[in-house]
Swiss-Prot record:
InterPro entries: Ribosomal_uS14 (IPR001209), Ribosomal_uS14_bac/plastid (IPR023036), Ribosomal_uS14_sf (IPR043140). Binds 16S rRNA, required for the assembly of 30S particles and may also be responsible for determining the conformation of the 16S rRNA at the A site. It comes from the Bacteria. This is Small ribosomal subunit protein uS14B. It comes from Enterococcus faecalis (strain ATCC 700802 / V583).
Length: 89
């Protein structure tokens, strides 16, 4: 489980990215790079660290499922992820 402060920071950052996305796009199309540099640093999408939706784990993140490899394995073994089953050959 990640620290609650890190999870809260990630949520705040996602909100900021969504808020500034149209402004950022308009400035990029206009070629106003000075205006872009005046936007908050955390408003840039590349600064966001993807985290597990259930417990906030930052590493081992699987984009397709939105969770960490550990949580994915637990839920897959329980059969809670549709279309996923343990490989056997």
């Amino acid at each position: 489980m990640a620290k609650k402060s890190k999870i809260a920071k990630a949520k705040k950052q996602q909100a900021m990215i969504a808020k500034y996305a149209p402004i950022r796009q308009a400035l990029k199309e206009a070629g106003d790079y000075e205006g872009l540099s005046k936007l908050p640093k955390d408003a840039h999408p590349s600064r966001l660290k993807l985290r597990d939706q259930t417990d906030g784990r930052p590493r081992g993140y699987m984009r397709k499922f939105g969770m960490s490899r550990i949580r994915f394995r637990e839920l897959a073994h329980q059969g809670l992820i549709p279309g996923v089953k343990k490989a056997s050959w």
